């Protein structure tokens, strides 16, 4: 039924846009004509997909590389096979092969613009066939259509635990903020996986309208493994909010989150906290005092500066300068000072420190970090000659430069310069197989 309605819609649209050939056809006749055309096309669809059924009945995880090729081949048959693939989402037999076939047909459909058959997916998702419902929920996450969000939201209240996780994942893929008020109550469930998915969705959708509920959920969250997800949400969605800041500050005690998450929290507070929020500034000053010249101290000083207190940066830089006067070959100290200088926009001095790190580096990982920092610093200074010089010296591959460009806008701009492109062409030729 769903498959045929999809074909019917496509046929009606084609007929409606045709000119001379169909000028004499009555609108009343269009559904019947569409049904007739669908019946005539069905044998061709069956024949086109027949070579694929056995392969698509294999377990995906055990045959991933092979099935990815076959799924790609099947998708290249185009929209004409959509009706047959939709039928396979609703197996008539409860067998492993039938379930595998449904899942792999869904993977083919993912590549065929699910938004063009969202009506059929909505019907399957609202139906009572468990396999079809599951596969349709997953496909709706790839259907860029307002109806997808409406259908997924409507299912939350009655869905089982597994389906709820998939519904929230699909909403996250769609970045559909308007579903947030339906989703956020799920933070009150005892399902940790579901709560984790809810937080990931809210951050991806930048759903700031539900921040008060998330603040309340954080105050009662008993699973420390989820705390980084709360930090991610507030970092992505909340700005200059005292209530959110008050909920986050206790995490700086570091008895519930690790060093890396503490670093992320310090960075997030530079935007989440209101400016000159005294409890935040007091906590950050304490971190500078207790962590000497570590990365935590650097991030705390930079966040303090963003909140209106420049003294933290001044004090920390003075401490680093004093230590480097006594320990002039200590690469780790240069690295912390370079990070501080880069963060406050002093790119020339940061570049000097990154070069010192390269001279005194204590390992390949530190050297690589220094080259990345140096390239980003020179790109911000628009020193193209220096950018090319350091690209040559770094020994990095074209692919590594492309990854850096994808992450860093100023370096991406520098990559477009003629001199940089000329160097990259030479580098690719030198690394090409002989």
Residue map of PLM features:
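Bacterial N-terminal signal peptides that target proteins for export
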Residues: 1-9
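Amphipathic alpha-helical scaffolding segments comprising HEAT/armadillo-like alpha-solenoid repeats
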Residues: 27, 42-55, 77-92, 114-126, ...
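Bacterial N-terminal signal peptides
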Residues: 10-17
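Pro/Ala/Gly-rich low-complexity, hydrophilic intrinsically disordered segments
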Residues: 308, 314-320, 424-434
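Structural detector for internal amphipathic alpha-helices that build alpha-solenoid repeat scaffolds
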Residues: 32-40, 62-77, 87, 97-114, ...
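Boundary at the C-terminal end of the N-terminal hydrophobic targeting segment
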Residues: 20-23
